């Protein structure tokens, strides 16, 4: 669903921070 896709994007952004 759209929620899952949004979550994946947020996770990617967090990974960039690490």
UniProtKB/Swiss-Prot annotation:
What is the annotated tissue distribution of the protein whose record heads this document? Expressed by the venom duct.
GO MF assignments: ion channel regulator activity; toxin activity
Name the source's superkingdom.
Eukaryota
Assigned GO CC terms: extracellular region; host cell postsynaptic membrane
Q: Any keyword Secreted?
A: yes
Please tell me where this protein is predominantly located: secreted
Keywords for the protein's UniProt record, in alphabetical order? Gamma-carboxyglutamic acid, Ion channel impairing toxin, Ionotropic glutamate receptor inhibitor, Neurotoxin, Postsynaptic neurotoxin, Secreted, Toxin
The membrane spanning regions, by residue number, are: none
The subcellular localization recorded is: Secreted
Record-listed 4-carboxyglutamate modification sites = 4, 9, 13
List other remarks: The mature peptide does not contain cysteine residue.
Function noted in UniProt:
Conantokins inhibit N-methyl-D-aspartate (NMDA) receptors.
* Name recorded for this polypeptide: Conantokin-Gm
Q: What organism does the UniProt record list as the source?
A: Conus gloriamaris
């Amino acid at each position: 669903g759209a929620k899952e896709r949004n979550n994946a994007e947020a996770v990617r952004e967090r990974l960039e921070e690490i």
